[in-house]
Amino acid sequence: DGIQNLTGLTVLTMFDRLITDISPLRHLTNLTDLVLHTNWISDIEPLSGLVNLERLIISENPISDIRPLAGLTKLRQLHVHGLYPNQLQYWLDMDDGRDPDVVFNGITDISPLAGLTELRLLRIHLNAISDISPLANLTNLIHLRLYDNQVEDISALADLNKLVLLWAHGNQIEDISPLSGMSEMQQLSLNDNGISDIGALGNMTEMDHLFLSDNTIEDIAPLQRLQALEVLRLENNDITDVSALAGLNQLRELSLARNWSLYDVQPLLRNAGIGAGDELDLRFTAVRCSDIDAFANRGVTLLRVTTVNGSGCPGRRLEDP
């Protein structure tokens, strides 16, 4: 009460306060930085006139309509992502008067973002978004998180060549060719999609973290030029040939678990960069126990169950990854 009189405020943080009504904030037109995450806010219309905002964090609220954001053209950072189901249940279990009938993760229309061309960071994950075409002109974006949505077509990202981080796992993406020009990419997560062709990744030579698990990838040859890779996760694909990884000497964490037909890892043994302190996951593959022991002798930390004869190597317990 009375916050509407603090018209000189430029920064305001009110998170996890069970706030439902933000109408007093409409008067705070000098705000440049506003944090309201983890409340119970559904109506963000009072924000529509806060045209000086450069950072806005309204994540983990039951917001479905983001039209009031359309005029906030100075925004450089916007967080409007949803909740994980276990988070929602946690808050409902608090029994502190929250309306249990509100809808989280309900954003479907992101067209109000189309004119926010100053955005550098955008987090819209954990929603119900299928059409990301409004992002096409946001060419200043550096960080974009849109995972756990319903996206199939990422052609709108083709000109977002400043991206260094893209997390798009948990969608229905099959064609990643629009990413081919993103030579500055450093962290890319595409787990749990429908990807088989990763040719578009071949020029991402700055990449240090790459996540491609739970797809249908057989050919990983395009990865051989990604000399900066430190973390690579390829579990649950259809990979049998790992020769492309022989020269990736910066790898410190590599997972090939659940590539059930993977047998020959000699190229990895030729990789002089894989050694003490590095982590290698070969669970639920057909890799020979003798090769697994060779990695162990180098000091590699191994998660080392195989499917040979349906059991682990001698002395090792069969366990789920």
Model-inferred region functions:
Residues 315-321:
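Low-complexity, Pro/Ser/Thr-rich intrinsically disordered segments
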